[in-house]
Amino acid sequence: MNVCADLPGAIRVGIRGGGGWIACGELVPAAGVGIFSNDATRPSARGRGAQTALIQARLRTAATLGLVCLMAEVAPGGTSERNYLRCGFTIAYRRAHYARTLE
């Protein structure tokens, strides 16, 4: 099964390496704001800068579109948070995430 969020106006970005796609994500522009979402990197490509390249590609696209504010939501303390911070994002707030198993 293939599942992909179908967000109106979403710009999908992919990073190639090693003969195929290794990372992908979206930039959703709306009213001057850009939302970075759905980041994914193949496990075999992790730790080699793929997500950073993905973030930088969307930053360039956002600048071309004239967006004035960019947002992303990531798990606190993880690799994605560190990558976004290195690319110039700052933490605006933290929020609780809840999980439950279905039995």
Task: Give the location of each predicted region.
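Residues that form or flank phosphate/diphosphate-binding pockets in enzymes
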Residues: G49, T79, Y93
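Conserved beta-strand-loop-alpha-helix junction that forms the acyl-donor binding cleft
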Residues: M71-E81, A99-L102
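Non-catalytic surface loops within mature trypsin-like serine protease
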Residues: G17, P43, P76, L102-E103
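Conserved acetyl-CoA-binding loop of GNAT-fold acetyltransferases
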Residues: L85-R94
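Conserved acetyl-CoA-binding loop-helix of GNAT-fold acetyltransferases
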Residues: N38-T41, G47-T64, R82, R86
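Conserved GNAT acetyl-CoA-binding A-motif
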Residues: A62-V74
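A conserved beta-strand-loop-helix scaffold within acyl/acetyltransferase catalytic domains
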Residues: M1-S44, Y93
